[in-house]
Amino acid sequence: MNMKRVLFLCLISFAAFSQTKPAAGSAAAAPVKPTRAAKYEVLYGSKPLSKADQKELNEFVASCDASFGSRAEAVAFFAERAWEYVATARLDTATQRFNLISALDPNSVDAFWGLGVISFQRGDNDLAIRLLNKGLELDSTQSMMRVDYAIVKLDCYQKGLECGTLDEVETELKHALAQDPKNANAWMKRSQVAYYKENYELAWTYFHEARVADILQLDLNFGALLEAKMPDPKGIFK
């Protein structure tokens, strides 16, 4: 789906992370969760629905069954709209749509993927990891979702949280690139992992792999940080 290509996870900048590893005791504080209506919470907050919400959900499912040739057709239609809401940062509306999709198909990969992305954007990395992992269990061929999963774990490492390590991130990125060798975003993140491991020559190798795959996805802020540690062996970036 084209809208997945503009996910905000893919736009995480490396510029804010000038250290090679998180400072001791620098773990980020847990985000304060705002109060939202149940329909705007991921999977309704995993709580029983109110009578009003359940009635609305039942009517939605019945309407889809009457209007579409199949549940799969309805899921595809609403997933496209939901990803558009993600792309325009309308996260509450996107959450509601993905919740509805989950009601149509409890095993919808789009629902778990989309809600995982939303959870990450809301600062709940643990929930994002659980949702994205479930999506990958349902369809392990989704290399772009695997990169999103790796990005969340990399964010955990960068924030000094226990939900991700560099080795875990590297494993997921290597897997994603085996599925799609031209995934520039995966090469960029792999370059960042090598940077954190202080293997700057390898970081440059991966950086140039990203350049060849899609120059528009290069993080030039990160490139400047890498260049400060070691000049570009190819002499392209100075």
For every predicted segment, state its role.
Residues 83-84, 109-185:
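Alpha-helical adaptor scaffolds
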Residues 48-58, 86-95, 123-126, 162-170:
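Helix-turn-helix repeat elements of alpha-solenoid scaffolds
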Residues 21-31, 37, 66, 73, ...:
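Terminal, low-structured helical/coil segments at or just beyond the last alpha-helical repeat
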Residues 1-22:
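Bacterial Sec-dependent N-terminal signal peptides
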Residues 95, 129, 163, 170, ...:
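Conserved positions within tetratricopeptide repeat
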Residues 19-88:
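N-terminal leader/linker segments that initiate helical-solenoid repeat arrays
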